[in-house]
Amino acid sequence: MVSASPSGKITLGYWNLRGGPRGNVARYLLAYGGADWNEKTYTIGEDEWKNEKGTVMDFCNLPYIIDGDFKISETYAVHNYCAQKYCPELIGTTPQDKARCHQL
């Protein structure tokens, strides 16, 4: 079972893929924003993810973020959360700027 990191670090869960594009964006956002995080990676074809999936959170998918008691999954939600929390200057301040960022 995956739970919040005892060190208070965020946990990022994703597939153990070389250059996995969806996981990399979250990593880039966390690094750019100066976050301290742990990674939990899963190997495709092994049962670890299948066995843990229901214990992480309801409706869990990869990537996911666990930040204390807050848990969220799905690529867009994870990216949006990381950007808002750690590097809000990247997502704009006006509705127009935010919309432009969302279309990227």
What residue spans do the PLM features occupy?
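GST-like domain detector, emphasizing the conserved glutathione-binding G-site
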Residues: M1-L104
